[in-house]
């Protein structure tokens, strides 16, 4: 687990709404706009409220998202596909969006409710992020907090920092994966990937 992930687990980040408003006003002035004109006068408030929602993952705990288990003993793969995700690229503060496919072999003490996997994706997506780390964090949390014996996470996303600026390739999608534990076995991994790719 890298230093960033550890720090997020240790600390509860606070949200400074007034600080965000002031930063937006300064940003608008810095790009040559008038933050007091009619169309922009309420923009700092709107962005401050939006960012509170977009970055709720900074205050959320992956352990809380995964806390409840059901007493079902299975060593078979559980897979939830096409979990919608929206995040913000930490390099340009532009959105990226797509889907996560999350599969795991449960711990011996039970399975999680299926909604827990979607909640876990939200915990890590709702923060300044890069897709590669997002994918790894989801996988690592399932091992660390749910005791999963095997994990596979695949994310497929479109990045607006590639679509709107720079190379401007709007149809490009980025795919990242993370595999842990029993799912590193080639046969088990192949089975999981076939289920993920089966549309």
Curated annotation (Swiss-Prot):
Name the Gene3D superfamilies on file: 1.10.286.10, 3.30.1130.10
Q: Which gene encodes it?
A: folE
Instruction: Report if keyword Cell wall biogenesis/degradation is assigned.
Output: no
- One BP annotation, GO: tetrahydrofolate biosynthetic process
What does the sequence similarity comment in the record state about its family? Belongs to the GTP cyclohydrolase I family.
Gene Ontology MF terms in the entry: GTP binding; GTP cyclohydrolase I activity; zinc ion binding
Q: Which Pfam families match?
A: GTP_cyclohydroI (PF01227)
Q: Which PANTHER family match?
A: GTP CYCLOHYDROLASE 1 (PTHR11109:SF7), GTP CYCLOHYDROLASE I (PTHR11109)
**GO cellular-component term (any):** cytoplasm
Cite the entry's keywords alphabetically: GTP-binding, Hydrolase, Metal-binding, Nucleotide-binding, One-carbon metabolism, Zinc
Name by which UniProt lists this protein: GTP cyclohydrolase 1
* EC number(s) recorded for this UniProt protein: 3.5.4.16
Assembly and binders: Toroid-shaped homodecamer, composed of two pentamers of five dimers.
Q: Which InterPro entries match?
A: GTP-CH-I_C/QueF, GTP-CH-I_N, GTP_CycHdrlase_I, GTP_CycHdrlase_I_CS, GTP_CycHdrlase_I_dom
Q: Is GTP-binding set as a keyword in this record?
A: yes
| Originating organism | Bifidobacterium longum (strain NCC 2705)
The kind of enzyme this is, by top-level EC class, is hydrolase
Which sites bind Zn(2+)? 89, 92, 161
Query: What reaction is this protein's catalytic activity?
Result: GTP + H2O = 7,8-dihydroneopterin 3'-triphosphate + formate + H(+)
Q: Which pathway is this protein assigned to?
A: Cofactor biosynthesis; 7,8-dihydroneopterin triphosphate biosynthesis; 7,8-dihydroneopterin triphosphate from GTP: step 1/1
């Amino acid at each position: 687990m890298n230093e960033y992930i550890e720090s997020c687990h240790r600390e509860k980040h606070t949200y400074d709404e007034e600080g965000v408003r002031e930063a937006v006003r300064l940003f608008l002035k810095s790009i040559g706009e008038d933050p007091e004109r009619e169309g922009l006068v309420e923009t700092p408030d709107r962005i401050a409220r939006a960012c509170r929602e977009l970055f709720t993952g900074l205050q959320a705990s992956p352990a809380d998202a995964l806390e409840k288990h059901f007493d079902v003993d299975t060593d078979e793969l559980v897979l939830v596909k096409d979990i919608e995700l929206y995040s913000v690229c930490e390099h340009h503060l532009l959105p990226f969006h797509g889907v996560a496919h999350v599969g795991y072999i449960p711990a011996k003490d039970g399975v999680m409710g299926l909604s827990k996997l979607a909640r876990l994706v939200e915990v890590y997506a709702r923060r300044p992020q890069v897709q590669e780390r997002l994918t790894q964090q989801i996988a690592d949390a399932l091992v660390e907090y749910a005791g999963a014996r095997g994990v596979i996470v695949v994310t497929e996303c479109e990045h607006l920092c590639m679509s709107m600026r720079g190379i401007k390739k709007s149809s490009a999608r980025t795919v990242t994966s993370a595999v842990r534990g029993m799912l590193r076995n080639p046969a088990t991994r192949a089975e999981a990937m076939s289920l993920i790719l089966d549309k």
